[in-house]
Design a protein with these regions (language model features):
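Conserved small-residue
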Residues: 29, 33, 40, 140, ...
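Long, internal scaffold/assembly segments composed of regular secondary structure
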Residues: 186, 208-254
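Beta-propeller domains
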Residues: 2-73, 79-107, 141-144, 153-156
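Beta-propeller blade signature
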Residues: 22-29, 94, 145-157, 203-221, ...
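Surface-exposed loop and turn segments in beta-propeller and other repeat-based domains
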Residues: 38-59, 103-116, 162-171, 224-238, ...
Length: 311
């Protein structure tokens, strides 16, 4: 790595009961600094109820190729979605991280009108702009149509519209990543908003109604070319992690829980012979526990699941 070490880190501050606005905290990470490890600046949002989760930059290596048309884009703005509000904040970190401030607010109605999506989740800067995955479709409860990915302009931050042209069987969404030299994307599934906004729905989980598929896309054509079902009992296929070397055509996805035995698992996907393949390559067993010490959902299993949520 040739880049200089980061001097400031950014993290999110949440209000669990929505009584206060969420915020962005700037932390000094310079060794030897008198404020090392401390919050040195906070950007408090003007609204309550946003529920921050993931966030990302406006620019990165995926967006700086000369072929993208913005090879000199500056990594300057943080894009922070509100998962519950469907609002997006653009934070300017210049002229200095300790002076970070709100640059633009994209209100939910604009996202609804231009994309038909809601509940923005993951942010990745990429070859066509800023890619934002969503967990909800249209309508009040986010179930009027499938969720997906939309594109924002990486300089003006205008919402440009849906990314997908042909989604195939994809009807849920969670994470996504790509292999730019090979021109494909991989996406995963979690749930629709009624299945997570007020907590997990036990009946849906035990009935295997959460996401359990991986979708493979032609990145430039924006078309779903293959879908692989991991098996209905493998509930909540979440974080997608490709190989760091972009010429290698494999990656990983974590699955939260197997509803037959509560184990978590990690799966490897790869492309061979023009087709994608997926195989379970690691498992994490549930931890035995006394039934009377467990919530009702787990008492019949007599165990606590590891709940793989990130890899």
């Amino acid at each position: 790595m040739q880049a200089p070490a980061e001097e400031f880190a950014y993290t999110l501050l949440l209000s669990p009961d929505f009584s206060r606005p969420d915020a962005l905290a700037v932390i000094d990470v310079k060794p030897g600094s008198s404020t090392y490890g401390k919050i040195v600046h906070t950007v408090t949002m003007p609204n309550t109820g946003d529920e921050f989760h993931h966030f990302g930059w406006n620019a990165c290596s995926s967006s700086l190729s000369p072929l993208t048309g913005h090879a000199f884009l500056e990594r300057r703005f943080l894009i922070i979605p509100g998962l519950r509000s469907s609002r997006i904040y653009v934070i300017d970190t210049k002229p200095h991280p300790t002076q970070a401030r709100i640059h633009k607010i994209i209100e939910p109605d604009e996202i609804f009108a231009k994309t038909g999506y809601s509940r923005p989740h993951t942010v990745h800067c990429g070859p066509e702009g800023i890619y934002v995955s969503t967990l909800g479709g249209a309508g009040k409860d986010g179930t009027d149509g499938a969720p997906g990915i939309f594109i924002m302009d990486c300089e003006t931050f205008d919402v440009l519209g849906r990314w997908e042209i042909d989604r195939g069987p994809q009807d849920k969404h969670y994470d996504f990543w790509w292999n730019l030299p090979r021109d494909y994307m991989v996406s995963s599934e979690w749930a629709l908003p009624p299945q997570f906004e007020n907590g997990i729905v036990p009946e849906d989980l035990l009935a295997n109604k959460y996401g359990h598929r991986l979708h493979f896309w032609d990145l430039r054509a924006r078309r779903n070319v293959q879908t692989i079902d991991l098996g209905a009992q493998h509930q909540m296929a979440l974080e997608v992690r490709p190989a760091h070397d972009p010429v290698r055509e494999y990656g990983f996805v974590g699955v939260v829980v197997d509803t037959t035995n509560l184990e978590g698992s990690i799966w490897t996907w790869w492309r061979e012979g023009g087709k994608f393949h997926v195989k379970k390559t690691a498992t994490i067993p549930a931890e035995p526990a006394a039934a009377d010490e467990l919530p009702p959902l787990l008492q019949g299993f007599g165990a606590v699941p590891p709940l793989v949520t990130d890899i």
